[in-house]
Amino acid sequence: MRDNTQHYRELFLDDIPLMDVRAPVEYHKGAFPNTVNRPLMNDIERQKVGTSYKQHGQQAAIALGHELVCGALKAERLAAWKAFAEANPNGYLYCFRGGLRSQIVQQWLKQDAGIDYPRVIGGYKALRNFLFETTRAAVDECDFVLVGGLTGCGKTEVIAALDNSLDLEGHANHRGSSFGRRATPQPAQIDFENRLAIDILKKRHRGVGQFVLEDEGRIVGSCSLPLELYQGMQGYPLVWLEDAFEQRVERILRDYVIDLRSEFERVVGVEEGFAAFSAYLQKSLAGIVKRLGGERYQRLAAILVQALEEQGRDGSVDTHRGWIEGLLKEYYDPMYAFQRQSKEDRVEFRGNQAEVIGYLRQRQALRPS
């Protein structure tokens, strides 16, 4: 039998498959990549056992757990654990603290299926703490630089072009603006933090000591950046990306209209997808009505409605440029100009996309760690 493990670093670096035997309610609050939920108890069973533990102690709770998970139900769950173990001979299982639940699953696998399967010592809590410390250590020990620029200038493309970048919006599955929602849901907060930490861990393992981030607010959709990282971002040097207004409009048209419509249609089907996409754009615009002001909002909303009608009818996207241009000129650009004033002393380079990518690569080569 392979030994139980405390080698948390290797689990994440090597993408080792993990079986989470916690209840679904625990799993959905946060877990790890390469993990599947094969619970010992469902949510109701867990609640009953927890109540018994509080009222009557550990032995009574264990006895109740064995009563609740027995017979055909036990056989069904055992079959799921057995299937995972056979499909993932290099994997591990874990519960919240690496205690009774994971030990019981180990015992049942051994007794009833003849399978020795190791667990993660310390369980979910130890893995989570390890990743938390991974992010904290990077903030303390590494060099960071931010990429800023006006809406639509292509900051995400710069992040994608660099091998030492951390894609905050990618990990959050959100573009970070009022219009940033994707067709698929955002991860849970803990999942977002875990994905980011694993990204940091893998890049540091490859020797990266200098990271490039997009200049973000604290909240990316519904995901909050780790506090230590966000606090550091208030002082990190800034590289400012520039692009022509017309190019920015075309990029937004591509990303937020053409590609996003296709994304919604892939997820929920053509007819429902276009309806969901249309509702998303209109809701996003309505979400900033107070900041736009009533008259401006009504004018841009009318252009958006007309644009969606034309797009739905014949696929034309030309009218979308009207509300995009209006939002940039009358809302986003003035807002960014105001915010940039407080960051001006941190700007160490300005340039177009090719120049910024070249500068950041040179910066990494000169100061790799």
Curated annotation (Swiss-Prot):
This protein's encoding gene: selU
CDD domains reported in the protein's UniProt record: RHOD_YbbB
Source organism, top-level taxon: Bacteria
Classification via InterPro entries: P-loop_NTPase, Rhodanese-like_dom, Rhodanese-like_dom_sf, SelU
Location of the Rhodanese domain: 12-136
Family: Belongs to the SelU family.
Residues forming the catalytic site: C95
GO molecular function ontology, one term from the record: transferase activity, transferring alkyl or aryl (other than methyl) groups
Keyword terms: Selenium, Transferase
Oligomeric form and interacting partners: Monomer.
Functional note: Involved in the post-transcriptional modification of the uridine at the wobble position (U34) of tRNA(Lys), tRNA(Glu) and tRNA(Gln). Catalyzes the conversion of 2-thiouridine (S2U-RNA) to 2-selenouridine (Se2U-RNA). Acts in a two-step process involving geranylation of 2-thiouridine (S2U) to S-geranyl-2-thiouridine (geS2U) and subsequent selenation of the latter derivative to 2-selenouridine (Se2U) in the tRNA chain.
Keyword Transferase: yes
Native species: Pseudomonas aeruginosa (strain ATCC 15692 / DSM 22644 / CIP 104116 / JCM 14847 / LMG 12228 / 1C / PRS 101 / PAO1)
Protein's UniProt name: tRNA 2-selenouridine synthase
PANTHER family hit by this protein: TRNA 2-SELENOURIDINE SYNTHASE
Membrane-crossing residue ranges in chain numbering: none
Top-level EC class: transferase
